[in-house]
């Protein structure tokens, strides 16, 4: 495989003269130097290479990278350990859907900037597994799952709305209590008006009767029965009002219509007496006008 041969060639070059570079003093860390060498090697561009602008590098084939390149440079084949090391030195992932990492001091052709990259915190050493017959490729945790489809979200929202609708909210109970309180106030006002009406009725009756001899409780019970009776109660009230307007003669009610007719007849007779024609009776000579003493007739009587 071309990638494996290129990796072997890079390993031989490092064993010849580049292994101890950056090991002490103020030089860059060995991890940064080895990573830069892997990215700069053009023979392995199909596995790992620089980005478009040379300010980041991309691991195109993580499996081949962990199997062929990591054992040559870091003596292990754990890709997740390599990613953790990058995070320790301040590298960040640029694109979510691929393994592209960047750091402000990690640029193409500018190895002198590697000394400016510092380790953020010490990590506990992890025992790397040897890459013997089988290659152990451990990848970082997968990316977070995609959001659910709209149909699932809609169904879950409907379930929440149905569950919330099953339990009545506190606002509905409060409004119902307020409505009951208003109804109670209305009934209290109607009762007060009924009592005032009863008092006014008693005051009116006191003009014609001795109210002190009346049993007020019986009157109130009768008034309640009349109100409950509906139309029958209204008729009894009308009869009671008619009795107040009429006059009793020896215990018998004299209808007001009869009185009106009597008054009308009396007025008619008075008018007839004033407008009655004088009959002329001839009693010899000369003519003498003698008024007739016969009864006058009303214009409406036959």
Swiss-Prot record:
Intracellular or extracellular location(s):
Cytoplasm; Nucleus
Q: Does the keyword Cytoplasm apply?
A: yes
Q: What family does the Swiss-Prot or TrEMBL record give for this protein? A: Belongs to the HSF family. Class B subfamily.
**PTM notes:** Exhibits temperature-dependent phosphorylation.
Q: Where is this motif: Nuclear export signal?
A: 211-218
Assigned keywords, A-Z: Coiled coil, Cytoplasm, DNA-binding, Nucleus, Phosphoprotein, Stress response, Transcription, Transcription regulation
Q: Give the gene that encodes this protein.
A: HSFB1
Pro residues bias (residue ranges): 139-150
Q: Where is the composition biased (Polar residues)?
A: 123-133
Q: What domain of life does the native source organism fall in?
A: Eukaryota
Q: Which organism is it from?
A: Oryza sativa subsp. japonica
Copy the domain comment: The hydrophobic-rich region (HR-A/B) corresponds to the oligomerization domain.
Q: What is this protein called?
A: Heat stress transcription factor B-1
Q: Where is the composition biased (Low complexity)?
A: 1-15, 151-172
Cited function: Transcriptional regulator that specifically binds DNA of heat shock promoter elements (HSE).
Query: Which GO cellular component terms, listed alphabetically, does the Swiss-Prot or TrEMBL entry include?
Result: cytoplasm; nucleus
Task: Say if the entry is tagged with keyword Nucleus.
Answer: yes
Give the start-end ranges of region Disordered.
1-33, 116-184
Q: A GO BP term, please? A: response to heat
State where composition is biased (Gly residues): 16-28
